[in-house]
From Swiss-Prot:
Molecular function GO labels: electron transfer activity; heme binding; metal ion binding
Residues noted as binding heme 7 in the record, renumbered to the chain: H260, C271, C274, H275
Binding site for heme 2: H82, C89, C92, H93
Matching CDD domains: Cytochrom_C3 (cd08168)
Pfam families, A to Z: Cytochrom_CIII (PF02085)
Source species of the chain: Desulfovibrio desulfuricans (strain ATCC 27774 / DSM 6949 / MB)
PROSITE patterns found in the cross-reference section: MULTIHEME_CYTC (PS51008)
GO cellular component: periplasmic space
Residue numbers binding heme 1: H67, C77, C80, H81
Positions annotated to bind heme 6: H227, C255, C258, H259
Protein name as annotated: Nine-heme cytochrome c
Length: 326
């Protein structure tokens, strides 16, 4: 009975605490999210916490970290909590940097790439380095990401630096001071997550079934590129991927690997609009048309570890032209 009484007391205390947080506007919205297996909050707001006693404002919006999604994808908590202590990142890494975090600023901790492997202990990963690792190692991502690098502009930053507009200046100030109540933090995070909408993919039926590449037909017959088949395959591979859904926030983005360096569009210009048959003397760094085709096709196949067609077998993609009777 003692154990039973203790359990009842613990349950009563937990319910009372939950009621208090709900009364303060804390966990009501957060409860709408699926709970994590670890017991950590399903989502939290990561504020740019600084060392200054009363900082004013911040250069960037806070980041809402969806702990639930990441927990499902990562086997070991120490992948992110590399010290083994599951505390907030800003405990050691602040805007200015502090001794506890080897003076590595919050910005570096979240965005650093090419992190050197530690001789002992866990090698830290940043948000950006982990995402980049995923796009390089997973076949469904590597095909495109092996040949293009996303432009790191304001739109790229806003994928993560995005929070509900209902957050007040007072809450922002408390957040960067490190004094925002956990319940209020989780409520803001949940509201942001619940407001996110998945971008509807473009229908493959809008794309050409085949594209005849004949601009360079000479020794070989025109190449019949199975455009819709390639597009459908790519879409099928990433349709349920949360990382792709987050960064492919416009349906045309999937087209932008091949149809690069032009405005996002479902009707992009032809490759020959920019790439000429001969090297353009005014733009010597721009590949000619034949090089552009082969860099794209072979680069994607290599990134996805596609065994066929082989780079050395020209007739797999375009048959040899019949020899003239002469």
């Amino acid at each position: 009975m003692r154990n039973g009484t203790s359990l009842l007391l613990l349950a009563a205390i937990a319910l009372a605490g939950a009621a208090c947080l709900t009364a303060m506007g804390g966990t009501a919205k957060a409860a709408a999210l699926e709970p994590t297996d670890s017991g950590a909050p399903s989502a939290i707001v990561m504020f740019p916490v600084g060392e200054k006693p009363n900082p004013k404002g911040a250069a960037m919006k806070p980041v809402v970290f969806n702990h639930l999604i990441h927990e499902k994808k990562i086997d070991n908590c120490e992948t992110c909590h590399h010290t083994g202590d599951p505390v907030s990142c800003s405990t050691c890494h602040t805007v200015e940097g502090k001794a506890e975090g080897n003076y590595i600023t919050l910005d570096r901790a979240m965005h650093a790439t090419n992190i050197a492997k530690r001789a002992k202990g866990n090698t830290p990963v940043s948000c950006v380095s982990c995402h980049e690792q995923q796009t390089k190692e997973r076949r469904e991502c590597a095909g495109c990401h092996a040949i293009v690098t996303p432009k790191r502009d304001e739109a790229w930053c806003a994928t993560c630096h995005n929070i509900t507009p209902s957050m007040t200046p007072e809450q922002m100030q408390k957040g960067i001071n490190g004094t925002l109540l956990p319940g209020d933090n989780e409520a803001l995070a949940a509201e942001t997550v619940l407001a996110q909408k998945t971008v509807e993919p473009v229908s493959p039926m809008l794309a050409p079934y085949k594209v005849v590449i004949d601009a360079l037909a000479d020794k070989y017959e025109p190449s019949n590129f199975t455009h819709r088949r390639h597009l459908t395959s790519l879409m099928e591979r990433i349709k349920d991927d949360k990382l792709a859904q987050a960064f492919h926030n416009k349906p045309e983005i999937l087209c932008a690997t091949c149809h690069h360096r032009s405005p996002l569009s479902l009707t992009p210009p032809k490759c020959g609009s920019c790439h000429t048959k001969e090297i353009d003397k005014a733009n010597p760094g721009r590949p000619n048309l034949m090089a552009a085709y082969h860099l794209q096709c072979m680069g994607c196949h290599k990134g996805m570890d596609v065994a066929r067609p082989r780079d050395t077998d020209c007739t797999t993609c375009h048959k040899a032209a019949p020899k003239s009777a002469d």
